[in-house]
């Protein structure tokens, strides 16, 4: 009999291997940035880094099917993507059974880009495919405050405005939204370098919108551990894998340090 994986743990292994240990409907939300097969490598933040292990591509069709299997009914899933990978990823997720609701476009913390930057537009946004297994409504959160004073009626007979917004746009740009990634100044200050590092505050917003406290958030490609930190920020548990030993060590250390600072108990191990 296969043992269930531990909550609040980052496993040093391939995501597909971890899938084989996870029962059906075990996780409450998926939030992940799977490899696109582009072997991303640059001198980001003036800290050259090696190619990402496993970034030569995955069997995305199998990945989509397994993601659907382990996700609880009536739950949300977010998959980062790129403009040139989006059609294929969309089709794989749809074939796996997901109901695809939106493609979110979120401003980066710094303008990125490689290749012909004199003949193409610099990439200043992250794309995420937002899916549902069944149907789950968004939580009412205190993340975005309405500009209008609470109780204001825009017209006679209309419902009074609430203090916090209950709907979110598909494009997150501007000062009221957190950026999708950390900029190079943050990376150098914290000595956390990863070519596709995500902003934990931004991820925590998605987690607060799409899950309840104590629920389990899954990320099969933990990278530097932003999803684990974001889950703890929001009072949720996490589970994930990272195949690259160096990044796995970084993720485990980062999660441990956050838990220590926040005085949150629970195991964080490889």
Sequence positions of predicted segments:
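Conserved SAM/SAH-binding loop
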Residues: 12-17, 268
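SAM-dependent methyltransferase catalytic-core segment centered on the flexible catalytic loop
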Residues: 25-76, 234
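Short conserved loop adjoining the S-adenosyl-L-methionine
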Residues: 18-24
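Beta-strand-turn-beta hairpins that frame and shape the catalytic cleft
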Residues: 2-10
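Phosphate- and divalent-cation-binding pockets in alpha/beta enzyme and binding domains
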Residues: 18, 84-89, 230, 250
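Conserved Class I SAM-dependent methyltransferase catalytic core
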Residues: 56-111
């Amino acid at each position: 009999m296969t043992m269930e994986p531990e909550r609040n743990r980052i496993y040093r292994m391939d995501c597909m291997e971890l899938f084989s240990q996870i029962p059906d409907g075990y996780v409450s939300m998926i939030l992940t940035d799977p490899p696109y097969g582009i072997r991303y490598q640059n001198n980001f933040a003036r800290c050259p880094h090696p190619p990402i292990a496993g970034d030569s591509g995955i069997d995305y069709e199998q990945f989509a099917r397994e993601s659907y299997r382990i996700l609880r009914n009536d739950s949300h899933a977010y998959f980062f993507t790129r403009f040139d990978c989006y059609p294929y990823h969309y089709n794989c997720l749809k074939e796996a059974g997901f109901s695809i609701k939106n493609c979110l476009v979120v401003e980066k913390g710094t303008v990125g880009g490689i290749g012909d930057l004199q003949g193409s537009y610099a990439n200043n946004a992250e794309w995420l495919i937002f899916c549902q297994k069944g149907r789950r409504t968004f939580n009412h959160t205190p993340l975005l405050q309405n500009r209008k004073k609470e109780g204001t009626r825009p017209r006679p007979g209309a419902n009074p405005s609430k203090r916090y917004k209950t709907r979110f746009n598909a494009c997150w740009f501007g000062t009221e939204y957190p950026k999708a990634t950390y900029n190079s100044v943050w990376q150098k200050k914290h000595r956390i370098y990863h070519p596709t590092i995500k902003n934990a505050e931004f991820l925590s917003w998605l987690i607060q919108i799409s899950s309840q406290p104590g629920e389990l958030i899954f990320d099969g490609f933990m990278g530097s551990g932003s999803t684990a930190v974001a889950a703890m920020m929001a009072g949720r548990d996490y589970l994930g894998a990272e195949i690259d030993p160096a990044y796995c060590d970084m993720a485990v250390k980062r999660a441990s340090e956050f838990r220590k600072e926040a005085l949150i108990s629970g195991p964080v191990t490889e």
